[in-house]
């Protein structure tokens, strides 16, 4: 198409030159040479374009075909920072350093001592290994022997070994992973929890509270820790869950008292 355009254009120019009697016309051989050069240039351009297309197709054919990402099916949960339960691997355990909480322990054996940050609490050993932990129970309770010092509420701390469910930070019920398979030996998840021994350590409520003006009661308080959990038995990951962490005295003013 471009060659035909060049020929028509040159014929048009030659016709103009023929009508112009005052201007000397171009020599015949010069005009023919110009036409030949234009045709050769157009042929060369088309040839180079075709070669570039062939090279590009050959290069793409040699590249390995990338697998297209699979579209999630309807009703299938998309993967975020949580993994399917069947894919629980060491990568999740490596994240424990980032999500570490002193009250959560992943271990292949039952812990016999409280975490270092909670050595002064009233630690209660695992009932299964009571004989082994009885000296420790005595040692960790020595701080209560100070004269003149009494706790408003009596608390106890222990490693919970059978936690199966919890409430996460969104208020959803999640399943706590009790055992995680990693390599040769599986590890279990333990939670160091603190709770009240009783709601009323004395007759009228909390110890040392003026019962004439106040109603008092010991209540277990909760806070959030990171733990390996699953939701709807599908997605496994580190979530914030609530566990018992302290015992506090709750007060309310008696009606009619000022």
Curated annotation (Swiss-Prot):
Main localisation: secreted
Glycosylation sites: 131
A family per Pfam: NTF3_N
Keywords: Cleavage on pair of basic residues, Disulfide bond, Glycoprotein, Growth factor, Secreted, Signal
Any single GO CC term annotated in Swiss-Prot or TrEMBL for this entry: extracellular space
Localisation per UniProt entry: Secreted
Family per record: Belongs to the NGF-beta family.
Protein name in UniProt: Neurotrophin-3
Originating organism: Rattus norvegicus (Rat)
Organism lineage: Eukaryota, Metazoa, Chordata, Craniata, Vertebrata
Gene symbol of the encoding locus: Ntf3
């Amino acid at each position: 198409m471009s060659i035909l355009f060049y020929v028509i254009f040159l014929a048009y120019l030659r016709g103009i030159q023929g009508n112009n009697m005052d201007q000397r016309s171009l020599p015949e051989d010069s005009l023919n040479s110009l036409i030949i050069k234009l045709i050769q240039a157009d042929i060369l351009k088309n040839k180079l374009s075709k070669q570039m297309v062939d090279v590009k197709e050959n290069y793409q054919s040699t590249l390995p075909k990338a697998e297209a990402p699979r579209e999630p099916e309807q009703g299938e949960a998309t993967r975020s920072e949580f993994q399917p339960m069947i894919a629980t691997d060491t990568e999740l355990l490596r994240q424990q350093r980032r999500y570490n909480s002193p009250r959560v322990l992943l271990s292949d054996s039952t812990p016999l001592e409280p975490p270092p940050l909670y050595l002064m609490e009233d630690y209660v050993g695992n009932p299964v290994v009571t004989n082994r932990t009885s000296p420790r129970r005595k040692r960790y309770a020595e701080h209560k022997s100070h004269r003149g010092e009494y706790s408003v509420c009596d608390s106890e701390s222990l490693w919970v070994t059978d936690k199966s469910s919890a409430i996460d930070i969104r208020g959803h019920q999640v399943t706590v992973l009790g055992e995680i398979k990693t390599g040769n030996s599986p590890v279990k998840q333990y939670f160091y929890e603190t709770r009240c021994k009783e709601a009323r350590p004395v007759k009228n409520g909390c110890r040392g509270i003026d019962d004439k003006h106040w109603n008092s009661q010991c209540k277990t308080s909760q806070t959030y820790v990171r733990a390996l959990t699953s939701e709807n038995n599908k997605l496994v990951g580190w979530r914030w869950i609530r566990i018992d962490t302290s015992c506090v005295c709750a007060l309310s003013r008696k009606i009619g008292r000022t």
